[in-house]
Amino acid sequence: AGETGAAVFADLGPAPDTENLPAEQVYLAVAKRFALLGARNFLFETLSAEDGVLEAIRALKQTVPEAFVLVSFAVLPDGYTREGRYCAELVRRVAQSGVVDAVGLNCVSAPGAMRALVQQLGDAGLPLSVMPNAGYPVVARAQVRYQGKPEYFARELSRLAAEGVRILGGCCGTTPQHIAALRTALDALPEALPAAPAAKPAAAAKSAVETDDAFLRKLRTGQRVIAVELDSPKDADMTAYLEGA
């Protein structure tokens, strides 16, 4: 990007998968168009699954072998995407594909929650990217705003850098002030940093653990079950809500 030396990425969001046009073809068509315009860095971001993405990237690299590709997933604070995919499994599959150069998380979660998610990933064997939202959205005077302050954003992400994350940025709600604060925080870190985040020992077994779920047990034994939807609590006091549950 001119004299700054910044890398410019072609940005591709989630592609719909329809009967007439599979997601793989959508990704590939858009990526090839970017490549014809001179793009050599590609960001596939805010994904809820890897369906069609890896196939498109594999085909893209046959045409543009020097392409640098970063794949990033949108993961909720509980560790799962909106399609129910567990973040550590997604990252592992993408990292093992052999066609992706970096992998990570972006959007949906705030910096603190995303830092907790990164601790579940461990060493993916690829550079890890983290681009959280500035915070969580609130509606004020008919406008959506993110309450996360630049100082909070910079503090949490600089901790991730100290733990081995190599690509840091921001998604929804981030401003030039957030990025400037992050740059200042990163400049204050020592030059020698870990090569990759360390995983918590129990994280790898999360998806394989069989829980003692009373609801699931009844379904398996053919018992009748009743589902009841509770209205959300009216304030921060959860006492009555939990008693009703």
What are these regions (language model features)?
Residues 1-245:
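Domain-level signal for soluble alpha/beta catalytic cores
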